[in-house]
């Protein structure tokens, strides 16, 4: 950003079936890193390698096409519309082509319910408004949506912030469920070390745009 270097020498590895926690206080560089990995910002130096191939992101679509899905704090959900409509949100299944296609509502309902069940949330009514769901359920909806639409790397931006303790535990259980699928790498952005310790396999600590520590879960035991 001009003469200011937001991230300097930051390096991290992520692997399918693992949670890599990225920790740091406000201003540490977590937001800049997540926006770079998700294509909002373009890196001015360094490299991003996905499945052995170097990639360059000029837009969020580039990152999405490479299999990187990001769930931000605001979740990009419409509280007044249904679970199913939020799950597909612009990528609805339709009969026919053009602006007058009919929505395949039953198929979309079935997919939304099944995908959320895979990671631990059972929805009895996919037509319920998202605003009636708990914060933890809304997080699960956003995560399930990212996975269904091809995320191989799932970036979670402060997923437990602004939630009550019970809802925080719901979200942590969801993260463990995704981890157990075995084929998705998870980057958990958080400032809550307790939550990170409950789910993460690897840790990277940031301060003022630089890595000040890293290690495996077993390194932090005790």
Identify the function of each model-found stretch.
Residues 1-222:
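Glycine-rich phosphate-binding loops of nucleotide-dependent enzymes
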